[in-house]
């Protein structure tokens, strides 16, 4: 059997794997990416794809701010002919309790200290700007007008296609079944058809599939999958509805550029599985919840429903770190907010793989924090 080689192997064709492949190919690195199905077939392509700078920790905010600097010109940069549907209609966090409102104020104060244009708004101010929203029970909101929406499928595909155009090898429908290591160093990967590829550096960025793959070389990751559901409606008149996140029951909704509405809700008790099955309980619950907030959508038909896996960690924050196996880098565990971090994730992984200093301090994302019981809690987690 002929062993093939590369400078860097990437396992996982979600947005982080694809963006890293793009960044490396742009730098002239010989990179090969393996994806078990099609690009974006896992969590990335099934994402609600809200873009936000509403976080409550400096580490996440620095990366989120970078993302929103990249997105406005990314379609032109990648130049694949696919529309990314980037819009900046804003992102709203809605408080129904004093304690929640106080935390939102703390988050906004931190954001504004980093020159992120977030604001607190009263119910009257919200009603004046978005008269179709029902304000019952709302005591205040946090809002950032620079935040918005992107198409998760075309974003991931565009990164992958641009990487291929620049010389990267992108192998879809080519599952990696195990990693290879020797004398404590990464050696490469083996695919389902028995093909062996060697490289001195491997990036494992396969969402919830990262945990079992890391175990093939003795690396224990704390990630686990959790199913989350979404639905999309038929299109209606476009009225630039922002992403609205209701912090009483976790429901959220937004209008997409084609006029459709996307609904989601974080229901408790969802199974820890990568299986993308549908939930009738979700369909009934989320429609009732969202229609209370935006009654104008009553009678609008649901076109389809789907689910996808979050890649959760115990503190619901990502892992971006070298593992105990020399040369094996992991970028996983984003716990539901990874799609929007595609630009920042690709940049820092490229910097690490090329021996450069990352543009942000990644200490809080280190793998050892779990064993050290020094968890990285984010107050603006959904």
Predicted segments, located by residue:
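C-terminal catalytic lobe of FAD-dependent flavoproteins
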Residues: 152, 291-382
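Glycine-rich FAD pyrophosphate-binding loop
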Residues: 25-44
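Active-site lid/adjacent beta-loop-alpha segment flanking the redox-cofactor pocket in flavoenzymes
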Residues: 235-327
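Central helical "cap/lid" subdomain
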Residues: 41, 195-241
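Flavin (FAD/FMN) cofactor-binding and adjacent substrate-gating region
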Residues: 70-73, 95-166, 171-172, 178-185
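Dinucleotide-binding Rossmann-like beta1-alpha1 core, especially the glycine-rich loop
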Residues: 49-129, 250, 289-291
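Beta1/beta-strand and adjacent pyrophosphate-binding region of the FAD-binding site
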Residues: 2-14, 32
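Core beta-strand elements of the Rossmann-like FAD/NAD(P) dinucleotide-binding domain
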Residues: 3-6, 191-201
